[in-house]
Amino acid sequence: MTINRFLVGGITFCAACMVSVTMSGETKSNAGSAYLLSQTKDMSRDFSDLSNTYFFADSLVSFNTADGTGIVEWKRQQLMPRQAFNANTYLHQPLKSLDFPDTAYPQNPRLSFTVVPVNARTLRIRVYTSPVTPKENDYESVMLAGQPVYDSSEWKISREGDDIYYISPYGSLEITGYPWRLVLRDASGKELTRTRVWSDNDSTQVKVAPFSFIKRGSDNSRSINPVWSISPGERIYGFGESATPLDKVGQQLNLFVTDPQGPETPDMYKPIPFFFSNRGYGMFMHTSAPVTADVGRSYIGANKLFMADEEMDLFVFFGNPKEILGEYTALSGRPEMPPLWSFGTWMSRISYFTEDEGREVARQLRANKIPSDVIHFDTGWFDVDWQCDYEFSPERFKNPAKMISDLKKEGFHISLWQLPYFVPGNKYFPELVEKGLAVKNGKGTLPYEDAVLDFTNPATVEWYQEKLGKLLSMGVGAIKVDFGEAAPIEAVYDNGSTGWYEHNIYPVRYNKAVADVTRKVNGENIIWARSAWSGSQRYPLHWGGDAASTDTGMEGTVRSGLSLGLSGFCFWSNDIGGFVTSTPEELYRRWLPMGFLTSHSRAHGAPPTEPWLYDNKEFTDYFRKCAQLKYALMPYIYTEAKECTETGLPMYRALLVEFPDDPGAWSVDDQYMFGSQMMVAPLFENVESRNVYLPGDADWIDYQSGKRYAPGWRDIKADGDLRCVILVRDGAVIPHAAVAQSTDRIDWDNIEWKHYGTPGVKKGKIFKPGMTEISVVDF
């Protein structure tokens, strides 16, 4: 990674605000109409800008197999307009350099790249666009769980003529000399993907630019664009919490942390620069700069990774989904086990405003025998709604410490909302500005009207954690880490970096600051966060944001959670019923079982969220049954959660992870595995049944009715009390507990093992509080 990009003479530039032409010939002009504040950035525009200079990877000049360092020559080109039969397009053409003095700036620069094996399944490939390369240890990447430990013992490195080969038991990399190209193969030698070169172009009109970088005419900064091939039938997954179809081929994704105001658009609270393919490879773009991934959208055979970074730092993985997720999370980190109580019911709305409201909600939950562990106070616990000052309103909360203590005795933990932005009317606003704790722009002033905490400043982190620490010491169990998507991109941060590198990574620093102080005070690994980037998965947990209270909002929520799980996140939640408006009872009934069959479950949104406030009194009974299901399954959930922390696999799991050899599993994105043994197919409309894909070669057992279903597509009725299709793998042994009103009252000494399907010798798994490892039980 290179820092201080776009910072020239103290001025921050936005290179996208220029006239550009797309590959299809469509003109896009941003002149005089720059991106709106915090708007998602499309970095592909840089690579169709007539004012930029283009450099294309051409030939291998040298390579040292002993240390993995090489030199590539890059050919200088420019974009030239072209008219043909009343159509205006453009083509890349060779460009003679006019740089002065010409002795200092070569026509075709020769720049370094490196290849380093991390382990038998992982390679790190770095390609530089400048003669000045960053030192390996000159910064601590918050995206990684420490510096990688390199082990090349299982790799054989050889040279044949101008070509270089890296071969391990799991895959290989071929570096061709001319044209310079990277080719990935599996252990059998089958090609997985390769970087595209000019000779790959086979269309008369669409000339796909190969691996390149640009030097921006506005500020001489650089961006790089590795272009990889996409094969027929290839499917690509990951890139973060996207509500679009799980298979990203045919899509363009802007990896730029933003507030999409719900999981219904391609924009994301949690973009993640990681993906994998059904062909057996994955890639992690180790950058915090904006990235645009054109995954076969503009050209079906090309996966273009437009990185607003001056180097490509790419980790390449070989394996199936479980193996690739394991390798990626071993690098970027896995979470410690969240506390048991966090897996229980969180009851919330926007917002409880008084101590009396909080106590009454707790009373109603216990009176109605709805198992629950958390009461969440959202934006209304301060004197002024939404103005975070870390203090309970003295008028509406007479004795918050006693309230917290009393509720804890009843089995309730308290969660509190806050955010890292301070409006001018906030009492802390002057202090943050005076002490330099807020982010500044190139002029040394605030880039926004609000003061935004600068988490690259150790003094800011100390100030912030002192405020949260007092609340946690009072007995608060969790802090809601809301927002974090609007870190100023036009800013200069305390560590010297600009917003082009700090915007996307702001959520990781934000998540970490809260997680660290929570662990320090409470000894527990728990937050409740909305925004994320690679590395945030170390700090559970994250929820899906402000879903619409609609059928499509529910469906988008499922896809978002599955996509985030395929991007390395073990734990995830959502606002049961949606957030934006009051949830219709019929929709709430369908959403509840799906919401409770998630690692973490919170009823939250526009009131009412409390079931006893609905006109239909039977709805409280239904809500209770959904909560009771989760508490009965708590031994299974807790055990599966522990396994996820050890493997990096998601609890909310796409079918393709468990069934990679079943082609049908790769196309399903509206049902999910809940852990390794259970499958959930929500009802997204007011219907009684739905088509469900049953993967694998064994039968599935209906959890509610006991009916048996053969593999394949089946129309299955939600045959039980809960409006959801819930299935268990044939042969599974699921541990259950007697339903308790809170997780601290579960009797872990009396586990009931329920056997599903075919009789025979079986094994079960169990992880209980106080245990250090999962125990396997034979039956």
Task: Spell out what each predicted region is.
Residues 1-31:
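Bacterial Sec-dependent N-terminal signal peptides
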Residues 21-332, 340, 350, 357, ...:
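N-terminal accessory segment at the very beginning of proteins
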Residues 118-120, 128-130, 169-171, 178-180, ...:
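An acidic- and aromatic-residue-enriched active-site/binding cleft used to recognize and process polar
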Residues 122-123, 172, 181, 273, ...:
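Beta-sheet entry/capping signal
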Residues 128-130, 138-144, 194, 224, ...:
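Aromatic- and carboxylate-enriched substrate-binding clefts and catalytic-loop regions
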Residues 333-336, 366-369, 562-563:
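Acidic (Asp/Glu)-rich catalytic clusters
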Residues 515-517, 524-525, 532-543, 556-560, ...:
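Catalytic core of carbohydrate-active enzymes
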